Amino acid sequence: MYLEAFLDYLKLERNYSAHTILAYNADIQTFFNFLQEEYQIDNPKLVEYVFIRAYVVHLSTRELSHRSINRKIASIKAYFKFLQKVGKIQISPLLKHKSLKIKKEIQIPFSPSEVNQVIENLSKSDAFEGKRDYVIISIFYALGIRRSELINIKISDIDFSSHVIKVLGKRNKERLIPMIKWLEGLIEEYISLRARTWGSNHSPYLLLTNKGDKLYETFVYRVIIRYFSEVSQKTKISPHILRHTFATHLLNNGADLNAVKELLGHSSLAATQVYTHSSIAELGKVYKNAHPRNLKN
C-alpha cells in the first residue's frame, strides 16, 4: 500500500504533527478495510472513483457530518496524490472529487463578562489544580493560541526578560507572542507553585496534569467545558471558541487585522477573517457612528 512511505512523507517533508499523522493513518486504513470487505480490494492501483463514491455513501449512513466526511476523504485524497507524485499510480481516482457542502456556522465568541467571570472565579484558588486551570484559560484568552500549542509550551519557551512566549504552530512554525503584564505575573506564580508541588526539574513542559504528566488534548477540552459551562448558555464550548474570542475582542477594541493575523499565526488574512465576529451591539455602534445620515442628526 506504500502507506509507511506516505506517513514518512507527512512527517519529514510536510512537518505534520504526530497527532495529524495518526489521523491520516486511521482514515486510510479504515478506507482500505472498507474496500477489502466490500470489494476484496487491497491494492491502491485498483481503486476507482466509483469506490470513493461508495465509501462516501457508507460514511453518510453512519450519521457523520459533512465536515467529518470531507476530512476523511481529504486524507485519502492526499494519499493518492502522493502515490501519483512518486509514480506508483498514473492518476488519482479522486482527481475530480468535490467535497460535500458544509453548512456555515457562525461561531459566537464568549462575551467579555463571561470570560471575566471565569477568570475571577479561578483567581481565588491557591491549589495546584485551580492555579493550573487558571493559567490554561488565561493563556488561551491572552495569547489566542491553539490547543496543541498550549500543550507543548515548555518553561524554556518563556522569556520573562523580553516578555514573550515562543509557541510551535502548525508544521513546526515557531512564532513569538508578547505577554501582557497580568499573564506574566500569573505564569510566574504558577511556576513557583509547580516547583513546590513537583520539583523544579520534574518536566520541561509548563502545564501538567494532576498526576504531573504532560497535558493532552481531551484534558484541556474538559477544563474549558468545566468552567465555561458554569457561566455560558452556549451549546458549543471548546478551546477553539476561546481562540475565536481572543481575536474578536481584540478587533472590537480597535486592533489591526494584520496584527491579529500575526498573533494567531495565520499565513493569510482570509484565515483570520474566519475567526472574527462582531456582536450585534458592536456592529450597531459602528454603524451609528459611521453612517453619514446618522451623523447629521
Describe the residue ranges of each PLM region.
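Conserved catalytic core of the tyrosine transesterase superfamily
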Residues: 1-297
